[in-house]
Curated annotation (Swiss-Prot):
<keyword id="KW-0012">Acyltransferase</keyword>
<keyword id="KW-0046">Antibiotic resistance</keyword>
<keyword id="KW-0359">Herbicide resistance</keyword>
<dbReference type="GO" id="GO:0102971">
    <property type="term" value="F:phosphinothricin N-acetyltransferase activity"/>
</dbReference>
<dbReference type="GO" id="GO:0046677">
    <property type="term" value="P:response to antibiotic"/>
</dbReference>
<protein>
    <recommendedName>
        <fullName>Phosphinothricin N-acetyltransferase</fullName>
        <ecNumber>2.3.1.183</ecNumber>
    </recommendedName>
</protein>
<comment type="similarity">
    <text>Belongs to the acetyltransferase family. PAT/BAR subfamily.</text>
</comment>
<feature type="binding site">
    <location>
        <begin position="99"/>
        <end position="104"/>
    </location>
    <ligand>
        <name>acetyl-CoA</name>
    </ligand>
</feature>
<keyword id="KW-0308">Genetically modified food</keyword>
<feature type="binding site">
    <location>
        <position position="130"/>
    </location>
    <ligand>
        <name>acetyl-CoA</name>
    </ligand>
</feature>
<keyword id="KW-0808">Transferase</keyword>
<dbReference type="Pfam" id="PF00583">
    <property type="entry name" value="Acetyltransf_1"/>
</dbReference>
<dbReference type="InterPro" id="IPR016181">
    <property type="entry name" value="Acyl_CoA_acyltransferase"/>
</dbReference>
<feature type="binding site">
    <location>
        <begin position="91"/>
        <end position="93"/>
    </location>
    <ligand>
        <name>acetyl-CoA</name>
    </ligand>
</feature>
<comment type="function">
    <text>Inactivates phosphinothricin (PPT) by transfer of an acetyl group from acetyl CoA. This enzyme is an effector of phosphinothricin tripeptide (PTT or bialaphos) resistance.</text>
</comment>
<feature type="domain" description="N-acetyltransferase">
    <location>
        <begin position="8"/>
        <end position="169"/>
    </location>
</feature>
<dbReference type="InterPro" id="IPR000182">
    <property type="entry name" value="GNAT_dom"/>
</dbReference>
């Protein structure tokens, strides 16, 4: 039996959301290997990242009945200028709100935003094994590109990292990426 579908609001993330986001992600940091951090984050770390990145990269949250239940966001892939049209995407859904379709809903909105902004390529880095994340990314058009074996050590074992990529059609040479506020 699947969980009951409830109304979901997808909206830009704000600093006020970051405590809830921090709780969501810290659950995975503490209990799994889907995130390779080993120490919990603070809400202020999330606020700092949001404020540093939100003009160029979309950061979205999903609310279910007024509660922040997930986040999808993008950030730079690499610091070199030639990578300006490539981003890294990330999504987390609260363990309390699984199987409601929030991951795909958040990601669909995030991908539309990134395409409208003029990004060319989106990379997802997935700690393996993580079959639900692999299925989600592949259902959204990402293609497996490679695996780094034993890339991280956490919870008593070595874990691989997989790279998935999705491309958008853009002209060459590309135009400058538009800020989030201009889409």
């Amino acid at each position: 039996m699947s969980p009951e579908r409830r109304p979901v609001e997808i909206r830009p993330a704000t600093a006020a959301d970051m405590a809830a986001v921090c709780d969501i992600v810290n659950h995975y940091i503490e209990t799994s290997t889907v995130n390779f951090r080993t120490e919990p984050q603070t809400p202020q770390e999330w606020i700092d990242d949001l404020e540093r990145l939100q003009d160029r990269y979309p950061w979205l949250v999903a609310e279910v009945e007024g509660v922040v239940a997930g986040i999808a966001y993008a950030g730079p892939w690499k610091a070199r200028n030639a990578y300006d049209w490539t981003v890294e995407s990330t999504v987390y859904v609260s363990h309390r709100h699984q199987r409601l379709g929030l991951g795909s809903t958040l990601y669909t909105h995030l991908l539309k935003s990134m395409e409208a902004q003029g990004f060319k390529s989106v990379v997802a880095v997935i700690g393996l094994p993580n079959d639900p994340s692999v299925r989600l990314h592949e259902a959204l058009g990402y293609t497996a590109r490679g695996t780094l074996r034993a890339a991280g050590y956490k919870h008593g074992g070595w874990h691989d990292v997989g790279f998935w990529q999705r491309d958008f059609e853009l002209p060459a040479p590309p135009r400058p990426v538009r800020p989030v506020t201009q889409i």
